Protein backbone atom coordinates (compact mmCIF):
# COMPACT_ATOMS: atom_id res chain seq x y z
CA UNK A 1 0.00 0.00 0.00
CA UNK A 2 1.33 3.45 -0.94
CA UNK A 3 2.25 5.55 2.07
CA UNK A 4 0.05 8.61 2.38
CA UNK A 5 1.48 12.07 1.89
CA UNK A 6 -0.54 14.93 3.38
CA UNK A 7 0.22 18.65 3.26
CA UNK A 8 -1.30 21.15 5.66
CA UNK A 9 -1.02 24.72 4.37
CA UNK A 10 -1.57 27.58 6.81
CA UNK A 11 -1.35 31.17 5.62
CA UNK A 12 0.79 33.38 7.84
CA UNK A 13 -1.24 35.93 9.91
CA UNK A 14 -3.60 35.93 6.91
CA UNK A 15 -5.88 38.94 7.45
CA UNK A 16 -3.03 41.14 8.71
CA UNK A 17 -0.78 40.04 5.86
CA UNK A 18 -3.45 40.98 3.30
CA UNK A 19 -3.75 44.41 4.91
CA UNK A 20 0.04 44.87 4.80
CA UNK A 21 0.11 43.85 1.16
CA UNK A 22 -2.61 46.32 0.24
CA UNK A 23 -1.14 49.10 2.38
CA UNK A 24 2.68 48.82 2.35
CA UNK A 25 2.92 51.53 5.03
CA UNK A 26 1.74 48.88 7.50
CA UNK A 27 4.68 46.53 6.87
CA UNK A 28 6.76 45.96 9.96
CA UNK A 29 4.12 47.59 12.17
CA UNK A 30 1.98 46.03 14.92
CA UNK A 31 -1.18 45.44 12.88
CA UNK A 32 -4.36 44.25 14.58
CA UNK A 33 -7.32 43.26 12.40
CA UNK A 34 -10.82 42.88 13.80
CA UNK A 35 -13.92 44.68 14.99
CA UNK A 36 -13.89 48.15 16.49
CA UNK A 37 -13.13 48.45 20.21
CA UNK A 38 -16.20 50.62 20.75
CA UNK A 39 -18.39 47.81 19.45
CA UNK A 40 -16.96 45.13 21.75
CA UNK A 41 -15.22 43.51 18.81
CA UNK A 42 -12.51 40.88 18.99
CA UNK A 43 -9.15 40.49 17.31
CA UNK A 44 -9.32 38.38 14.15
CA UNK A 45 -5.59 38.38 13.39
CA UNK A 46 -2.51 40.08 14.80
CA UNK A 47 0.79 40.53 13.00
CA UNK A 48 3.91 39.12 14.65
CA UNK A 49 4.88 42.64 15.67
CA UNK A 50 1.55 42.95 17.52
CA UNK A 51 1.91 39.50 19.06
CA UNK A 52 5.12 40.71 20.70
CA UNK A 53 2.86 42.94 22.84
CA UNK A 54 0.75 39.95 23.87
CA UNK A 55 -2.06 40.56 21.38
CA UNK A 56 -3.62 37.41 19.92
CA UNK A 57 -6.67 36.30 17.98
CA UNK A 58 -10.03 36.11 19.81
CA UNK A 59 -8.83 38.73 22.32
CA UNK A 60 -11.29 41.59 23.02
CA UNK A 61 -10.24 44.69 21.09
CA UNK A 62 -10.45 46.76 24.27
CA UNK A 63 -7.78 44.55 25.84
CA UNK A 64 -5.67 44.72 22.66
CA UNK A 65 -5.75 48.53 22.83
CA UNK A 66 -4.48 48.39 26.41
CA UNK A 67 -1.62 46.05 25.50
CA UNK A 68 -0.72 47.81 22.26
CA UNK A 69 -2.02 51.40 22.37
CA UNK A 70 0.15 52.46 19.42
CA UNK A 71 -0.89 49.56 17.21
CA UNK A 72 -2.41 49.95 13.76
CA UNK A 73 -6.03 48.85 14.08
CA UNK A 74 -7.76 47.79 10.86
CA UNK A 75 -11.41 46.83 10.46
CA UNK A 76 -11.83 43.40 8.86
CA UNK A 77 -12.54 43.30 5.10
CA UNK A 78 -14.04 39.86 4.72
CA UNK A 79 -14.99 40.30 1.07
CA UNK A 80 -11.32 40.87 0.28
CA UNK A 81 -10.17 37.94 2.41
CA UNK A 82 -12.69 35.64 0.75
CA UNK A 83 -11.51 36.74 -2.69
CA UNK A 84 -7.87 36.02 -1.81
CA UNK A 85 -8.86 32.72 -0.20
CA UNK A 86 -10.58 31.74 -3.44
CA UNK A 87 -7.33 32.35 -5.32
CA UNK A 88 -5.44 30.18 -2.84
CA UNK A 89 -7.97 27.34 -2.95
CA UNK A 90 -7.82 27.44 -6.75
CA UNK A 91 -4.06 26.86 -6.53
CA UNK A 92 -4.57 23.92 -4.18
CA UNK A 93 -7.04 22.32 -6.57
CA UNK A 94 -4.66 22.77 -9.47
CA UNK A 95 -2.48 20.16 -7.74
CA UNK A 96 -5.07 17.74 -6.39
CA UNK A 97 -8.81 17.30 -6.11
CA UNK A 98 -8.34 16.02 -2.56
CA UNK A 99 -8.47 19.40 -0.81
CA UNK A 100 -10.19 19.88 2.55
CA UNK A 101 -10.46 23.58 3.48
CA UNK A 102 -10.61 24.19 7.22
CA UNK A 103 -11.07 27.97 7.02
CA UNK A 104 -10.31 30.83 4.65
CA UNK A 105 -6.59 30.46 5.30
CA UNK A 106 -5.84 26.79 5.82
CA UNK A 107 -6.45 23.43 4.17
CA UNK A 108 -5.31 19.83 3.98
CA UNK A 109 -4.16 18.39 0.65
CA UNK A 110 -3.67 14.70 -0.09
CA UNK A 111 -0.89 14.54 -2.71
CA UNK A 112 -0.10 10.83 -2.39
CA UNK A 113 -0.77 10.28 -6.09
CA UNK A 114 1.73 12.98 -7.12
CA UNK A 115 4.75 11.77 -5.16
CA UNK A 116 7.56 10.13 -7.15
CA UNK A 117 11.14 9.16 -6.29
CA UNK A 118 12.31 12.37 -7.99
CA UNK A 119 9.40 14.45 -6.68
CA UNK A 120 9.08 14.24 -2.87
CA UNK A 121 6.13 15.72 -1.02
CA UNK A 122 8.31 18.49 0.44
CA UNK A 123 9.18 19.70 -3.05
CA UNK A 124 5.51 19.78 -4.05
CA UNK A 125 4.72 21.73 -0.87
CA UNK A 126 7.33 24.31 -1.78
CA UNK A 127 5.93 24.61 -5.30
CA UNK A 128 2.49 25.26 -3.83
CA UNK A 129 3.90 27.92 -1.51
CA UNK A 130 5.71 29.46 -4.49
CA UNK A 131 2.49 29.58 -6.53
CA UNK A 132 0.60 31.18 -3.65
CA UNK A 133 3.21 33.92 -3.40
CA UNK A 134 3.29 34.50 -7.16
CA UNK A 135 -0.49 34.95 -7.31
CA UNK A 136 -1.21 36.72 -4.01
CA UNK A 137 2.16 38.10 -2.81
CA UNK A 138 1.44 36.37 0.52
CA UNK A 139 3.53 33.81 2.38
CA UNK A 140 2.31 30.48 3.71
CA UNK A 141 3.72 27.82 6.00
CA UNK A 142 3.41 24.13 5.22
CA UNK A 143 3.59 20.89 7.13
CA UNK A 144 4.18 17.56 5.39
CA UNK A 145 3.61 14.16 6.93
CA UNK A 146 1.89 10.81 6.54
CA UNK A 147 -1.32 11.86 8.30
CA UNK A 148 -3.44 14.96 8.95
CA UNK A 149 -2.61 15.36 12.64
CA UNK A 150 1.13 15.40 12.05
CA UNK A 151 0.86 17.60 8.95
CA UNK A 152 -1.03 20.24 10.94
CA UNK A 153 1.44 20.02 13.79
CA UNK A 154 4.31 20.44 11.33
CA UNK A 155 2.83 23.51 9.63
CA UNK A 156 3.02 25.46 12.88
CA UNK A 157 6.58 24.55 13.75
CA UNK A 158 8.49 26.86 11.44
CA UNK A 159 6.32 29.95 11.02
CA UNK A 160 6.24 32.29 9.23
CA UNK A 161 7.00 31.23 5.66
CA UNK A 162 8.40 27.86 6.66
CA UNK A 163 8.24 24.18 5.74
CA UNK A 164 8.50 21.28 8.19
CA UNK A 165 8.43 17.56 7.46
CA UNK A 166 7.50 15.04 10.14
CA UNK A 167 8.33 11.49 9.15
CA UNK A 168 8.98 8.16 10.83
CA UNK A 169 12.60 9.09 11.54
CA UNK A 170 11.76 12.17 13.65
CA UNK A 171 8.14 11.81 14.77
CA UNK A 172 8.85 10.20 18.16
CA UNK A 173 11.45 12.77 19.18
CA UNK A 174 9.22 15.68 18.15
CA UNK A 175 6.14 14.36 19.96
CA UNK A 176 7.98 13.45 23.16
CA UNK A 177 9.47 16.95 23.52
CA UNK A 178 6.28 18.80 22.60
CA UNK A 179 4.56 20.94 25.21
CA UNK A 180 1.11 19.47 25.78
CA UNK A 181 -0.49 22.82 24.92
CA UNK A 182 1.08 22.68 21.46
CA UNK A 183 -0.76 19.50 20.47
CA UNK A 184 -3.43 20.40 17.87
CA UNK A 185 -6.84 20.25 19.52
CA UNK A 186 -5.58 20.82 23.07
CA UNK A 187 -7.00 24.14 24.25
CA UNK A 188 -6.61 26.06 27.50
CA UNK A 189 -9.20 24.02 29.40
CA UNK A 190 -7.74 20.68 28.27
CA UNK A 191 -4.23 21.87 29.05
CA UNK A 192 -5.26 22.87 32.57
CA UNK A 193 -6.89 19.50 33.19
CA UNK A 194 -3.84 17.67 31.87
CA UNK A 195 -1.57 19.65 34.18
CA UNK A 196 -3.79 18.56 37.07
CA UNK A 197 -2.88 14.99 36.14
CA UNK A 198 0.85 15.79 35.70
CA UNK A 199 0.76 15.72 31.91
CA UNK A 200 3.01 18.52 30.67
CA UNK A 201 4.68 17.08 27.57
CA UNK A 202 4.12 14.54 24.85
CA UNK A 203 6.32 12.18 26.82
CA UNK A 204 4.00 12.45 29.84
CA UNK A 205 1.00 11.74 27.60
CA UNK A 206 2.80 8.81 25.98
CA UNK A 207 3.48 7.27 29.39
CA UNK A 208 -0.24 7.08 30.21
CA UNK A 209 -1.96 3.90 29.09
CA UNK A 210 -5.11 4.03 26.98
CA UNK A 211 -7.49 2.95 29.73
CA UNK A 212 -6.23 5.63 32.12
CA UNK A 213 -6.63 8.34 29.48
CA UNK A 214 -10.19 7.18 28.75
CA UNK A 215 -10.92 7.25 32.49
CA UNK A 216 -9.55 10.79 32.80
CA UNK A 217 -10.84 12.32 29.55
CA UNK A 218 -13.71 10.11 28.42
CA UNK A 219 -14.02 9.38 24.69
CA UNK A 220 -11.24 11.89 23.94
CA UNK A 221 -8.83 9.65 25.81
CA UNK A 222 -8.41 7.24 22.91
CA UNK A 223 -7.66 10.11 20.55
CA UNK A 224 -5.07 11.52 22.96
CA UNK A 225 -3.48 8.09 23.26
CA UNK A 226 -3.17 7.93 19.47
CA UNK A 227 -1.85 11.49 19.16
CA UNK A 228 0.99 10.74 21.54
CA UNK A 229 1.99 7.99 19.11
CA UNK A 230 1.47 10.02 15.95
CA UNK A 231 -1.53 7.93 14.87
CA UNK A 232 -4.36 9.46 12.82
CA UNK A 233 -6.46 7.50 10.32
CA UNK A 234 -8.68 10.41 9.22
CA UNK A 235 -8.71 10.98 5.48
CA UNK A 236 -8.66 14.26 3.59
CA UNK A 237 -12.28 14.91 2.64
CA UNK A 238 -12.62 16.76 -0.65
CA UNK A 239 -15.17 19.57 -0.35
CA UNK A 240 -16.25 19.48 -3.98
CA UNK A 241 -15.45 18.06 -7.39
CA UNK A 242 -13.16 20.32 -9.39
CA UNK A 243 -14.91 21.87 -12.41
CA UNK A 244 -12.23 24.21 -13.75
CA UNK A 245 -8.54 25.08 -13.69
CA UNK A 246 -7.34 28.63 -14.08
CA UNK A 247 -4.58 31.12 -13.41
CA UNK A 248 -4.72 34.87 -13.02
CA UNK A 249 -2.21 37.63 -12.39
CA UNK A 250 -2.44 41.22 -11.21
CA UNK A 251 -0.12 43.64 -12.99
CA UNK A 252 2.09 45.84 -10.81
CA UNK A 253 0.71 48.86 -12.70
CA UNK A 254 -2.38 49.23 -14.89
CA UNK A 255 -1.64 48.11 -18.47
CA UNK A 256 -3.17 48.72 -21.91
CA UNK A 257 -0.22 47.54 -24.01
CA UNK A 258 -1.33 44.55 -26.12
CA UNK A 259 2.17 43.07 -26.31
CA UNK A 260 2.54 43.04 -22.53
CA UNK A 261 -0.94 41.61 -22.01
CA UNK A 262 -0.56 38.90 -24.66
CA UNK A 263 2.77 37.81 -23.19
CA UNK A 264 1.01 37.45 -19.86
CA UNK A 265 -1.82 35.48 -21.50
CA UNK A 266 0.79 33.16 -23.04
CA UNK A 267 2.33 32.68 -19.59
CA UNK A 268 -1.06 32.00 -17.98
CA UNK A 269 -1.97 29.54 -20.73
CA UNK A 270 1.22 27.64 -19.98
CA UNK A 271 0.54 27.62 -16.24
CA UNK A 272 -3.01 26.41 -16.82
CA UNK A 273 -1.77 23.63 -19.11
CA UNK A 274 0.71 22.53 -16.42
CA UNK A 275 -2.05 22.37 -13.83
CA UNK A 276 -4.30 20.36 -16.13
CA UNK A 277 -1.41 17.98 -16.59
CA UNK A 278 -0.97 17.59 -12.84
CA UNK A 279 -4.58 16.57 -12.23
CA UNK A 280 -4.83 14.58 -15.48
CA UNK A 281 -7.70 16.59 -16.95
CA UNK A 282 -8.61 18.38 -20.17
CA UNK A 283 -11.45 20.83 -20.74
CA UNK A 284 -14.10 21.96 -23.21
CA UNK A 285 -14.43 25.64 -22.27
CA UNK A 286 -11.93 28.49 -22.13
CA UNK A 287 -12.64 31.73 -20.28
CA UNK A 288 -10.67 34.97 -20.24
CA UNK A 289 -11.32 37.37 -17.37
CA UNK A 290 -10.25 41.01 -17.21
CA UNK A 291 -10.40 43.39 -14.27
CA UNK A 292 -10.12 47.02 -15.38
CA UNK A 293 -8.33 49.82 -13.58
CA UNK A 294 -11.76 50.80 -12.23
CA UNK A 295 -12.12 47.30 -10.68
CA UNK A 296 -14.86 46.31 -13.14
CA UNK A 297 -14.69 42.59 -13.99
CA UNK A 298 -15.63 41.39 -17.48
CA UNK A 299 -15.18 37.95 -19.03
CA UNK A 300 -15.87 35.95 -22.17
CA UNK A 301 -16.09 32.19 -22.64
CA UNK A 302 -15.86 29.84 -25.62
CA UNK A 303 -17.23 26.29 -25.67
CA UNK A 304 -15.37 23.64 -27.65
CA UNK A 305 -16.39 20.44 -29.37
CA UNK A 306 -13.24 18.58 -28.33
CA UNK A 307 -11.38 18.91 -25.01
CA UNK A 308 -8.01 20.67 -24.94
CA UNK A 309 -5.08 20.68 -22.55
CA UNK A 310 -1.98 22.13 -24.26
CA UNK A 311 -0.54 25.62 -23.86
CA UNK A 312 -0.85 26.32 -27.59
CA UNK A 313 -4.51 25.34 -27.80
CA UNK A 314 -5.40 27.32 -24.69
CA UNK A 315 -3.47 30.39 -25.83
CA UNK A 316 -5.00 30.44 -29.32
CA UNK A 317 -8.51 30.55 -27.90
CA UNK A 318 -7.59 32.96 -25.09
CA UNK A 319 -5.99 35.27 -27.69
CA UNK A 320 -9.27 35.47 -29.62
CA UNK A 321 -11.32 36.01 -26.46
CA UNK A 322 -9.03 38.79 -25.29
CA UNK A 323 -9.32 40.58 -28.63
CA UNK A 324 -13.10 40.41 -28.31
CA UNK A 325 -12.98 41.87 -24.79
CA UNK A 326 -10.31 44.55 -24.97
CA UNK A 327 -10.89 48.27 -25.09
CA UNK A 328 -7.69 50.15 -26.03
CA UNK A 329 -8.86 53.13 -23.99
CA UNK A 330 -9.29 51.18 -20.75
CA UNK A 331 -6.18 49.93 -18.90
CA UNK A 332 -6.46 46.63 -17.05
CA UNK A 333 -5.06 45.57 -13.70
CA UNK A 334 -5.73 41.81 -13.83
CA UNK A 335 -5.95 39.10 -16.50
CA UNK A 336 -7.05 35.49 -16.01
CA UNK A 337 -7.31 32.34 -18.14
CA UNK A 338 -9.49 29.38 -17.11
CA UNK A 339 -10.24 26.01 -18.69
CA UNK A 340 -13.54 24.45 -17.59
CA UNK A 341 -15.93 21.55 -18.28
CA UNK A 342 -13.16 19.18 -17.24
CA UNK A 343 -12.97 15.52 -18.08
CA UNK A 344 -10.46 12.78 -17.44
CA UNK A 345 -7.54 12.58 -19.84
CA UNK A 346 -4.59 10.25 -20.33
CA UNK A 347 -1.29 11.79 -19.27
CA UNK A 348 2.29 10.68 -18.95
CA UNK A 349 3.76 10.07 -15.50
CA UNK A 350 4.74 13.32 -13.83
CA UNK A 351 8.31 14.29 -13.04
CA UNK A 352 9.77 17.20 -11.17
CA UNK A 353 10.02 19.15 -14.43
CA UNK A 354 6.23 19.37 -14.66
CA UNK A 355 6.22 21.59 -11.57
CA UNK A 356 9.06 23.98 -12.39
From Swiss-Prot:
The record marks 15 as: Substrate discrimination. It comes from the Bacteria. Its EC number is 2.7.7.7. This is DNA polymerase IV. The lineage of its organism: Bacteria, Bacillati, Bacillota, Bacilli, Bacillales. Monomer. It comes from Staphylococcus epidermidis (strain ATCC 12228 / FDA PCI 1200). InterPro entries: DNA/RNA_pol_sf, DNA_pol_Y-fam_lit_finger_sf, DNA_pol_Y-fam_little_finger, DNA_polymerase-Y, DNApol_IV, IMS_HHH_1, Rev_trsase/Diguanyl_cyclase, UmuC. It catalyses: DNA(n) + a 2'-deoxyribonucleoside 5'-triphosphate = DNA(n+1) + diphosphate.
